Amino acid sequence: MHEAPDPLRLELAAAAARLIADSGLDYANAKKKALRQVLGDGPVPRGSMPDNDEIDAALREHLELFDADHARRVAERRRTAAALMKRLQAFHPYLTGAVWKGIVTEHAPIHLQLFHDNPKDVEIELLNEGVDFEVSTVPHFRSGAEVEAIGFYLGDAPVLLSLYGHDDLRGALRGGPAGAERGNRDALLERLEQAA
């Protein structure tokens, strides 16, 4: 028998989704702020915190209801991602995050995970193309250890490249409970074709 959804959990997911859509917060900070908005300083009942998949569902619903440009933005960012993946094909790019999932806020970057053993090669390629970028770090999708990331804009679209070793690709292709968490250019083109 399937349990009825917890109303508090749904409310927290909706509040976090609004914060992500309207303020560009990341999921962790949106959850914290949603907790304060909904519960104040009160205790958090056990099991009431929504997971990222629940927030994704609430965010998709929010964007479909309140963002008339959402479908256009998804298609536009996916086309931009496909073109960028073609340019960076030597680095084995995979699209992940909001653009892959099709829940693209104004603030959501095109997040490509590159699987290449020398991050400097990626930087040199971007410098040769005249791309103005910033280097930072992001947590590894599996271990949580810091990996190099490169951020820049392509037109008005923010881009985030996270750089992994080639061997990391093996573990990256396992699907999660919500399906594949990333896809190569062929998989992205298939999604674009399905949406057309």
Regions found by a protein language model. Give the residues of each.
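Mid-length scaffold segments of soluble, non-membrane domains
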Residues: 109, 113-115
